[in-house]
């Protein structure tokens, strides 16, 4: 699910935090990619020929096709990807997973009804909703990446959190995912649409963490509370509080505890046994592998291994696979070209920029308190600058 309404909120109130670029703009960059998100995209993709990609036994192979050619495209553009795979979900996510299971059951019923009615559009729609990434899909993708010479990381828990840890440690430039909670985990850069197909002609959308904090006039802790109010995977949100009201409340009261002390209980109902504090701690201290101990290496591809793995039962075209392997080799040889900024040492993310945002937020808080004192503490939040 990510964070509900966050991207639009940033676009509306902190547009300076978003930049659109072509893929080639990221030449020479190392990027941590949410592997499960990619595999899902590949599995639901419909080939222009309309045929289902599958082995001789009928097992889908579209995830491998997507991973193979999309990774080659990234490398062709000078980007060095590292794929990060999900581990076990945190206990707090059980509620969200239960909701997904319910939606899946509803989709199965709707698919049956569409099939009985001969509704082709409905069949396609509900088939897509039933797609999920399995352990077998992930296992095959890892084997493929190894043969391609591309590194991957097994996260102990959430992939987005591990990606953010790699960014903060200076191991990679950005996190590439469609889930905005990578920012909540503290990734200083987030790239959306990086792994979309070239045919969709979507520019890569880059979000800057420091600029969004500055634009929203909040610090990192307040941003986490904002994301919880908007709606995240780890706890319920307060019904009736949308993005606009959420940022007003955070700008006025600065944390959820103070918001709850001042919230109109006749207007808003707080969820029973609301686990917002545990969710907050999960964002602040997620379960991740130590990024400093992770060694990322891009090595030469195994052409014969790729042919053996992808052709035969998986029915990939051998000539295309060999051509792909040659492109991988060519990109490996071209990696001697570097970005100008790579001549300077890349340091892990520091709190300096967020401290500046915090100072600005504290000033805003002081101003808000003065305003409340003058007006005897009105309940409405000020509109953020």
From Swiss-Prot:
Mg(2+) 1 binds at residues 34, 86, 158, 160. Residues 1-104 are annotated as: N-domain. Phosphorylated. Phosphorylation upon DNA damage induces relocalization to the nuclear plasma. SUPFAM superfamilies: 5' to 3' exonuclease, C-terminal subdomain, PIN domain-like. InterPro entries: 5-3_exonuclease_C_sf, Flap_endonuc, HhH2, PIN-like_dom_sf, XPG-I_dom, XPG/Rad2, XPG_CS, XPG_DNA_repair_N. Residues 346-385 are annotated as: Disordered. One of its GO terms (molecular function) is 5'-3' exonuclease activity. Residues 336-344 are annotated as: Interaction with PCNA. Structure-specific nuclease with 5'-flap endonuclease and 5'-3' exonuclease activities involved in DNA replication and repair. During DNA replication, cleaves the 5'-overhanging flap structure that is generated by displacement synthesis when DNA polymerase encounters the 5'-end of a downstream Okazaki fragment. It enters the flap from the 5'-end and then tracks to cleave the flap base, leaving a nick for ligation. Also involved in the long patch base excision repair (LP-BER) pathway, by cleaving within the apurinic/apyrimidinic (AP) site-terminated flap. PANTHER family: FLAP ENDONUCLEASE 1 (PTHR11081:SF9), FLAP ENDONUCLEASE FAMILY MEMBER (PTHR11081). Belongs to the XPG/RAD2 endonuclease family. FEN1 subfamily. This is Flap endonuclease 1. The gene is Fen1.
């Amino acid at each position: 699910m990510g964070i509900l309404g966050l991207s639009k909120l940033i676009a509306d109130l902190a547009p300076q935090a978003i930049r659109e670029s072509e893929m080639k703009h990221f030449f020479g960059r190392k990027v941590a990619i949410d592997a499960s998100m990619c595999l899902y995209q590949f599995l639901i993709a419909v080939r222009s020929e309309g045929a289902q990609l599958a082995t001789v036994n009928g097992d889908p192979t579209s995830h491998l096709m997507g991973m193979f050619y999309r990774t080659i495209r990234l490398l062709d553009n000078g980007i060095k990807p590292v794929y990060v795979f999900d581990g076990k979900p945190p206990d707090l996510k059980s509620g969200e997973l239960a909701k997904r299971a319910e939606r899946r059951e509803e989709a199965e019923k709707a698919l049956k009804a569409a099939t009985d009615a001969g509704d082709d559009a409905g069949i396609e729609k509900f088939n897509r909703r039933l797609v999920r990434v399995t352990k077998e899909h992930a296992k095959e993708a890892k084997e493929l990446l190894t043969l391609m010479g591309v590194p991957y990381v097994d996260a102990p828990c959430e992939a987005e959190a591990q990606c953010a840890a790699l960014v903060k440690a200076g191991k990679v430039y950005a996190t590439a995912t469609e889930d905005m909670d990578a920012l909540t985990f503290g990734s200083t850069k987030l790239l959306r649409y990086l792994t979309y197909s070239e045919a969709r002609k979507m520019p890569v959308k880059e979000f800057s963490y420091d600029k969004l904090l500055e634009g929203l006039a909040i610090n990192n802790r307040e941003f986490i509370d904002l994301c919880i109010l908007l709606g995240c995977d780890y706890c319920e949100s307060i019904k009736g509080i949308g993005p606009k009201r959420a940022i007003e409340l955070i700008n006025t009261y600065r944390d959820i505890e103070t918001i709850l002390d001042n919230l109109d209980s006749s207007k808003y109902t707080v969820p029973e046994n609301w686990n917002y504090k545990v969710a907050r701690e999960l964002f602040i201290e997620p379960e991740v592998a130590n990024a400093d101990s992770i060694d990322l290496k891009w090595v030469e591809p195994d052409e014969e291994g790729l042919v053996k793995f992808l052709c035969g039962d998986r029915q990939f075209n051998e000539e295309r696979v060999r051509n792909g392997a040659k492109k991988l080799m060519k990109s490996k040889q071209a990696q001697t070209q570097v970005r100008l900024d790579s001549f300077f040492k890349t340091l892990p993310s520091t709190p300096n920029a967020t401290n500046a945002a915090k100072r600005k937020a504290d000033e805003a808080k002081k101003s808000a308190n003065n305003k409340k004192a003058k007006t005897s503490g009105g309940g409405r939040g000020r509109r953020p600058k």
